[in-house]
Regions:
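DPxDG-like acidic metal-binding loop motif
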Residues: 28-38
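Short amphipathic alpha-helical segments
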Residues: 6-10, 30, 105
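Amphipathic alpha-helical interface segments
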Residues: 32-33, 43-121
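A short glycine/serine-rich beta->alpha loop
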Residues: 12-21, 92-98
């Protein structure tokens, strides 16, 4: 359900609540892999192994083409940059400075390609 997905993914913005850690769109890819491939049996190491392999392959592809999976690195920020928990206003000027929309599209594209290759869609 769209509303549930939006609620679950809201904290992903800004590299997990503006902490500038793993990019939210990368985390979103990983969630989709879990939905497509995972199961609810935590003792099933075969499934877990396959999910982890897929996550690592997607992360490597994203990093290879974009230089990182870390938000602050993708944005060109220094590690010691102090970020507020208050999100910036989303204006046209804001989006001109951010690669986020393009990275979201890129992640969706490689995820779709991967899911097709694995016959999951």
């Amino acid at each position: 359900e769209k509303e549930t997905a939006l609620k679950i993914s809201e904290p992903f913005g800004g590299g997990m609540g503006r902490m500038r850690e793993v990019c939210g769109t990368v985390t979103g890819m990983f969630m989709v892999i879990g939905l497509a491939m995972g199961n609810d049996n935590s003792k099933d190491n075969t499934t877990k192994k396959n999910v982890y392999k897929s996550v690592q392959e997607l992360a490597a592809k994203f990093k290879e083409d974009n230089g990182s999976i870390i938000c602050r690195e993708l944005l060109g920020f220094q590690k010691n940059n102090k970020e507020s928990y208050v999100p910036s206003e989303r204006t046209n000027e804001y989006y001109k400075k951010r690669p986020c929309p393009e990275l979201c599209k890129y992640a969706a594209d490689i995820l779709e390609e991967y899911l097709k290759k694995e016959n999951l869609i």
